[in-house]
Regions:
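Extended, helix-rich architectural segments
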Residues: 1-357, 362
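Extended, charged amphipathic alpha-helical segments
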Residues: 326-464
C-alpha cells in the first residue's frame, strides 16, 4: 500500500499477508526502509525528520531566550556593515517568563488515585459490611443490653465508630471504608509513579507541550516492572495522523544515538567484524546528516564509537486460527493452527476452521544508513484494553492538542513574532538613546597652559 505524506509516496509493505511473512526479517527490513524513506530521505527536500528537528530546536532556543541574533543584525546592517553600531544584541528574555508561568501552572496534582473494586467478591464483601452496620444501627438498644447483662460485644464495629443513621452510613462508605485489595491497588499505582519519578517526567512533558506543541512518553514492562520514559519529540517519528492524541497511528519510532558498548549489551549476538562495518557506515550517515548549526560538535572519535539506531513499533494484526474437531462422543475440541491452515470444504470432514483477527505490535531496531535490522519480533506484554482484548495500544503516548491537518502549533510558536518585534524595538531604543546623547568635549591641557591672562599668569587646566 502506498502511504502519501507529501508530494512523493512512500511504499510500505502490504499488511494483507500471512503471519509467517510478517514475522520474517525481510518483511521487517521492508518496513524499516519505508520508514527511513518517509522521514530521512533528503532527495525530495530536507527530510521530514530533519525539518521537524530544526524547527523544534528553533522553538527551544526562543523558549530559553537564546534565539539567533542574525536576523536582528540584518535589520540594522547597512550593506552588511555593523561597525558603526554599538548595541547590546543579547535577546530580551520575554518568552522564558511566560513559559515558566504556564508550565508551573500545570504541575499541581489536584486529585489523588482512588481504587474502587467492582468484582463480584469485593462487591459481596461491601454489601455484607453495609448490612452488618445497618443491623447494628437498628439494634443499638439490644446490643447495649447484651453488653450490660452478658459482658459480650456482638457489634461489628465499635460503638464510637457506628454511624447514627443511614445518611451517615452512606457517607462513611464513601470516605472511610476501604478493602485491602483497593488499598493495595492504590499503593501499587503510587509506587509506579514514585519509582519512575513521575513529577519530573510530567514537568518535562508539559514543557514540551508548551514549547513544541507536542509531548511524548514511552511505557515498557521489563524485569524492573512498569517503566515510564521521557521521549524527546525531536527524535520521535510517527505515521501520518490528524488525531491530536495519535491514537490511529500504526507506527512510532525513536531515533537514539548509542555507543558501541551499549549496542553490544543490547544485541550480544552481533559479531565484532559486523559491528566494525556498521560503525563505518553509520558514521558516514551521521557526517552527511549532521546539522552543525543546531547540534553540538561531535568529534571523530565519537562518530567512530556511536551508531544512530531507529527503535520503532509497527502495528498490524494476526489471525488466531483454530481447528474445531468433532469427537466420537459428539463434543468439540479446539486445536490451535497457523493461519495457513485451510481445510477442504467437505461436509464429510468432522472439523472446521475458525479464525479471529486481533491487533499486535512488532518491535524493531534498525541502524540508519545501513541495511542492518538488529531486531524484528512480535512484542511481549502488549497493552490491551480490558473491554476489547482484540485491540492493542502502542507503547508511545503522544499528545499534540493544537494539531490541525498534521501541522503542530505551540504557544511559543505563536509568541515568536512578538518576541522579534520586542527585540527590534529594544535595539531601536538603544540606537535612539545613543543619538540623543550629546557629543563629548575635548580639552587640550597643553593649549590651556599657554593662555596668557594678562596679569602675568597663565591659565591652567585646574582652573578650567
Amino acid at each position: 500500500m502506498a502511504i502519501t505524506t507529501g508530494q512523493f509516496p512512500t511504499q510500505f509493505p502490504s499488511q494483507a499477508v500471512s503471519d509467517e511473512v510478517k514475522t520474517s526479517r525481510d518483511y521487517g527490513l521492508s518496513v524499516s526502509r519505508a520508514i527511513e524513506q518517509e522521514w530521512f530521505n533528503r532527495d525530495n527536500g530536507a527530510g521530514m525528520y530533519f525539518q521537524t528537528r530544526d524547527e523544534f530546536h528553533r522553538l527551544r532556543l526562543y523558549a530559553r531566550g537564546e534565539q539567533s541574533i542574525r536576523k536582528y543584525k540584518d535589520e540594522f546592517a547597512v550593506n552588511g556593515d555593523l561597525s558603526y553600531l554599538n548595541l547590546d544584541w543579547k535577546p530580551v528574555p520575554i518568552i522564558p517568563k511566560f513559559v515558566d508561568i504556564v508550565v508551573n501552572g500545570m504541575q499541581d496534582r489536584l486529585f489523588d488515585i482512588t481504587a474502587f473494586a467492582q468484582d463480584p467478591i469485593s462487591t459481596g464483601k461491601r454489601t455484607k459490611f453495609v448490612n452488618d452496620i445497618q443491623r447494628d444501627i437498628n439494634a443499638q438498644g439490644l446490643l447495649k443490653q447484651i453488653e450490660n447483662q452478658l459482658g459480650v460485644s456482638a457489634r461489628n464495629v465499635p460503638e464510637e465508630d457506628l454511624p447514627a443513621n443511614s445518611e451517615e452510613l452512606e457517607l462513611y462508605m464513601q470516605l472511610g471504608y476501604k478493602q485491602g485489595i483497593e488499598i493495595a491497588e492504590e499503593q501499587a499505582i503510587n509506587n509506579v509513579f514514585l519509582s519512575n519519578k513521575f513529577p519530573q517526567l510530567k514537568k518535562r512533558f508539559d514543557y514540551d507541550l508548551t514549547v513544541l506543541g507536542i509531548g511524548a512518553v514511552k511505557n515498557t514492562f521489563n524485569t524492573d516492572g512498569i517503566k515510564l520514559d521521557y521521549v524527546d519529540p525531536a527524535n520521535l517519528i510517527w505515521s501520518y495522523t490528524e488525531d491530536p492524541n495519535f491514537e490511529d497511528c500504526y507506527y512510532f519510532g525513536e531515533v537514539k544515538r548509542i555507543s558501541l558498548n551499549e549496542l553490544k549489551k543490547q544485541f550480544p549476538a552481533i559479531p565484532d567484524e559486523e559491528l566494525f562495518e556498521l560503525t563505518k557506515k553509520g558514521s558516514n550517515w551521521v557526517d552527511y546528516n549532521q546539522d552543525w548549526r543546531n547540534s553540538s560538535s561531535t568529534s571523530e572519535m565519537d562518530n567512530n564509537n556511536t551508531l544512530t539506531v531507529l527503535y520503532f513499533n509497527w502495528k498490524t494484526w494476526e489471525n488466531n486460527v483454530y481447528k474445531i474437531k468433532e469427537t466420537s462422543t459428539g463434543a468439540s475440541r479446539a486445536i490451535a493452527k497457523d493461519d495457513n491452515f485451510n481445510p477442504p470444504q467437505d461436509k464429510r470432514n468432522r472439523f472446521e476452521r475458525v479464525a479471529q483477527a486481533r491487533e499486535v505490535v512488532y518491535e524493531g531496531a534498525f541502524v540508519l544508513g545501513t541495511d542492518t535490522l538488529l531486531k524484528w519480533k512480535k512484542a511481549t506484554n502488549m497493552i490491551r484494553p480490558s473491554s476489547n482484548t482484540n485491540k492493542v495500544l502502542m507503547n508511545y503516548t503522544v499528545s499534540a492538542p493544537r494539531m490541525y491537518k498534521g501541522n503542530i502549533t505551540s504557544l511559543v510558536s505563536k509568541m515568536t513574532p512578538y518576541a522579534d518585534l520586542i527585540q527590534l524595538t529594544h535595539l531601536k531604543l538603544q540606537q535612539a538613546i545613543q543619538r540623543m546623547t550629546p557629543s563629548g568635549v575635548f580639552i587640550d591641557a597643553d593649549g590651556l597652559a599657554e593662555v596668557d591672562l594678562g596679569n602675568g599668569t597663565n591659565y591652567n587646566a585646574q582652573e578650567a
